[in-house]
């Protein structure tokens, strides 16, 4: 009788425990994770001053992005390149802020979209100070003076436009 009870207990334990022990699926390194898709994005754009003169132009600039190539994502990703060019081209030590550039991201700061890029009465590149997060000119200049973008100063001005020709 004791033997039958012992065998019954063993069978119950085997039924419960064996799947747990035998269910080895291998290491985590064996799991095939799908690679993230990249989107090939092509952008052409011009930055013109208020007279219509093209100041900066890029034709068929190509890059890869994880984000879908909407105009918003294109502007957002593209900004650092444009900013770099503006800092090099603008000899008057003023700055043109264009679109959603991410500056000093590790400290949680984010530069929202600027609506009007402008030139002042002397033709210097300038900005009306309007951003999506309402940074004041003083705040922007304070961040710029730390060398996070380039040596530049934002001033008030007239009219400057960014034209995105589209994405593929």
Walk through the language-model features, giving the residues of each:
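Ubiquitin-like/PB1-type beta-grasp interaction modules and other compact soluble beta-rich domains
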Residues: 23-168
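Hydrophobic helical h-region of N-terminal Sec-dependent signal peptides
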Residues: 9-16
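C-terminal motif of bacterial Sec signal peptides marking the signal peptidase cleavage site
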Residues: 18-22
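Bacterial N-terminal signal peptides that target proteins for export
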Residues: 1-9
């Amino acid at each position: 009788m004791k033997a039958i009870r012992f065998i019954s207990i063993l069978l119950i334990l085997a039924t419960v425990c064996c799947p747990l022990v035998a269910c080895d699926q291998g290491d985590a390194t064996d799991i095939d994770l799908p690679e993230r898709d990249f989107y090939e994005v092509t952008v052409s754009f011009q930055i013109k001053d208020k007279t219509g003169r093209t100041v900066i132009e890029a034709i068929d600039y190509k890059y890869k992005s994880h984000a879908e190539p909407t105009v918003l994502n294109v502007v957002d990703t593209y900004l650092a390149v444009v900013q770099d060019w503006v800092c090099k081209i603008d000899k008057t030590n003023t700055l043109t802020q264009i679109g959603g550039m991410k500056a000093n991201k590790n400290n949680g700061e984010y530069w929202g979209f600027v609506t009007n890029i402008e030139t002042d009465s002397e033709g210097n590149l300038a900005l009306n100070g309007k951003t999506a997060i309402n940074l004041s000119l003083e705040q922007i200049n304070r961040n710029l003076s730390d060398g996070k973008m380039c040596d530049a100063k934002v001033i008030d001005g007239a009219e400057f436009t960014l034209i995105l020709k589209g994405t593929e």
